[in-house]
A protein has these predicted regions:
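N-terminal post-signal-peptidase region of extra-cytosolic proteins
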Residues: 1-3
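Alpha-helical cap/lid subdomain in secreted, periplasmic
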Residues: 6-12, 43-68, 72-121
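Catalytic nucleophile-elbow at a beta strand-turn-alpha helix junction centered on a G-D-S/GDSL motif
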Residues: 13-39
Length: 121
């Protein structure tokens, strides 16, 4: 966090990555159409990453804030761990992690896998 604070203090660009599942991606609900399977409703402009970007830009007016959204619908923490390098290669100054919704449907072994993967992330 010291490096991030230094960048903000020195008015250097900051990169924040959001890493998670459909909640991170911007999925807010599932729609049911007659005779069709559930259909996710995405509103990426309302995703929490966008809301936090607005807050950062308001609070840190003289610093450019670059947001990377690495949310993928259906991802579990284990799936996220498998693709973490894709996000880290951009060298974000901060990473906000949000997995768990898809992991919550697992049995006890799946919950242990979630915990292990999240610790590695």
């Amino acid at each position: 966090m010291n490096k991030l604070a230094d960048k903000i203090k020195n008015k250097k660009p900051v990169t924040i990555a959001f890493f998670g599942d459909s909640v991170t991606q911007g999925c807010f609900e599932l729609r049911v159409a007659e005779g069709k399977p559930f259909e996710p409703v995405y509103r990426p402009w309302e995703a929490y990453s966008k809301k936090l970007q607005q807050i950062f830009e308001y609070c840190i007016k003289d610093t450019s804030v670059n947001i990377l959204n690495y949310g993928i619908s259906g991802d579990t923490a284990t799936m996220g761990l498998a693709r973490i390098d894709e996000m880290l290669c951009h060298k974000p100054d901060m990473v906000i992690v949000c997995f768990g919704l898809n992991d919550s449907t697992k049995d006890i072994d799946g919950i242990k896998e979630y915990k292990d993967s999240l610790e590695k992330i």
